[in-house]
Design a protein with these regions (language model features):
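Short helix/strand-capping connector loops at secondary-structure junctions
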Residues: 1-2, 322-339
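N-terminal pre-domain/capping segments
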Residues: 2-148, 157-159, 166, 177, ...
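Active-site beta-loop-alpha junctions enriched in small/polar residues
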Residues: 48-50, 80-82, 115-118, 154-156, ...
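Acidic/histidine-rich catalytic cores of soluble enzymes
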Residues: 76-77, 113, 184-188, 192-304
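A short helix->loop->beta-strand "cap" motif at the edges of active sites that frequently abuts
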Residues: 108, 207, 316-320
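Active-site-proximal loop/short-helix segments
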Residues: 152-173, 218-219, 224
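A short, acidic, amphipathic alpha-helical segment used as a generic capping/interface helix at domain edges
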Residues: 301-315
Length: 367
């Protein structure tokens, strides 16, 4: 993924550049004025979607995931750094090199690797084990030629239920109990200490860490920026995701993207997608199923909050991937959790939806 060294282009700058170009053209002037440069947002398929955790059925191999991504029309894949997909101990250098070539032969790219780390534990041995895991994930990322490793401050985890499907609530309860009574400032300090070491190791391997705006330690995108500033490493940047933003109003999303600016090197989108009739609009159900609550739909999203978010990404000159992930408790039909056909349908429609959103964002910027 290309790294951006130029300052973020604000909407005001973009409009000003476009106005100058139009004025010169109208005057018939001979001076060549460069057109405003937009970023490029490319859809990728995040392997957690086919990990065999959330649906009833087996996980795809990464080779099968690659084939699906190619067939559906995605431009890259992101690899979750845990079994059965990307656990670093399963991926020595030779295997990484072989898979890297296979991906290149398809014309796709490995958009990144996703670590599942928790640097927040009050138990030193646990933090050190997490740091060792991230070290190995950094090595694997470099061997795969991916260059970007998504990281958390804290990831409580998830588990597969005996009847099939995944849940977050048990892991979250364990995390809550482990951190009970510990000052937030201390938790923050532990996370920062680990990230300082991880960023140094990433730099040694030519890898950049992308800190995601994911709870529980991170509460707003301002926390992400604060941590990046405090670590102070060129090898730690940002993965800002719209679906988990604390506020999804258009102006707030635009400001967040603008504030992050050139630090943004990765993003994701998610959720469920459906189409009621052939050729009809793609609908996005509002799903409430995390933390052990039964799966329930609460209507449909009326506004596309991804549109202002992606428009802002394009304005800032972001050139990178936005990965699709389906990673929540899924519906039960006829007494069974839905299977891989449900996942396939969502992955196809999600790609169509995000392509349309990217195209509309571009139209609004150049019109």
């Amino acid at each position: 993924m290309k790294q951006r060294n130029s300052p973020a282009m604000t909407r005001r700058t973009f409009i000003a550049q476009a106005a100058r170009a139009a004025a010169v053209a109208a005057a018939g002037g001979g001076v060549s004025v460069a057109k405003p440069v937009l970023g490029e947002v490319k859809p990728a398929l995040y392997s957690v979607t086919y990990l065999g955790l959330w649906y009833l059925g087996d996980a795809l191999t990464l080779e099968q995931l690659l084939e699906r991504a190619k067939r559906f029309g995605y431009q890259g894949i992101e690899i979750e750094a845990k079994r059965p997909h990307g656990f670093p101990l399963d991926w020595p250098a030779k295997r990484c090199e072989e898979f890297r070539k296979r991906v290149a032969d398809t014309g796709l790219a490995i958009s990144g690797v996703a670590a599942m780390n928790d640097f927040s534990s009050p138990i030193a041995e646990h933090r050190e084990a997490q740091l060792a895991n991230v070290r190995d994930a950094i090595r694997m990322t470099a061997d795969l030629g991916a260059r970007v490793l998504r990281v958390f401050l804290a990831w409580p985890g998830a588990h597969r239920t005996p009847e099939g499907g995944g849940r977050y609530d048990i892991a979250q309860k364990i995390w809550d109990a482990t951190h009970e009574g510990i000052p937030e400032t201390q938790i923050w300090s532990w996370c920062r200490e680990c990230l300082v070491e991880a960023a140094r190791m990433a730099g040694d391997h030519g890898v950049t860490l992308a800190l995601q705006n994911h709870k529980p330690v991170i509460k707003t995108y301002h926390d992400v920026l604060r941590m990046v500033r405090e670590v102070g490493s060129p090898h730690l940047k940002v993965c800002l995701d719209a679906p988990i933003m604390e506020n999804k109003e258009a102006e707030y999303l635009r400001k967040a993207v603008s504030d992050v600016g050139g630090l943004q090197i990765q993003s994701h989108f998610g959720g469920e997608y459906e189409r009621k009739t052939p050729g009809g609009p793609i609908l996005r159900p509002i799903v409430q199923s995390q933390w052990g609550a039964p799966y329930a739909r609460k209507g449909y999203f009326q506004d596309n909050f991804y549109l202002p978010f992606i428009q802002a990404l394009l304005e800032t000159g972001y050139k990178g991937y936005i990965g699709y992930e389906l990673c929540h408790t899924l519906p039960v039909v006829n007494g069974k959790t839905v299977g891989i056909d449900f996942v396939d349908s969502n992955a196809r429609l999600a790609l169509e939806f995000i392509r349309e959103t990217i195209a509309e964002a571009k139209r609004r910027l150049v019109s």
